[in-house]
From Swiss-Prot:
Could be involved in insertion of integral membrane proteins into the membrane. The keyword Membrane applies. GO terms for cellular component: plasma membrane. It comes from Chlorobium chlorochromatii (strain CaD3). HAMAP family: UPF0161_YidD. Belongs to the UPF0161 family. Its main location: membrane. This is Putative membrane protein insertion efficiency factor. NCBIfam families: membrane protein insertion efficiency factor YidD. Residues 72-94 are annotated as: Disordered.
Amino acid sequence: MSIWKIINAIPIVLIRLYRTFLSPLLGPSCKYVPTCSSYALEAFERHNFFYALWLTIWRILRCNPFSKGGYDPVPPLQGTQQSSSHHQESSHHG
């Protein structure tokens, strides 16, 4: 396992803990599909730590009362196409 996989594992574990314990208490609040936590999880699973962190921060900043929300997938890796499997996610873990 590379050092970057280990580094990416830290936010992945934190996001999963948030989704398991905190998100159910807060209720659905994300305007986007996938939800912000799903987006962040996918970003860290797909991209390097720094790019995933940037994508996650930028997404959270855009998830505000003034945004319309909607479908906003994680960008694919360079040279690949976006999978449609995450588009149909109906989870409301924000």
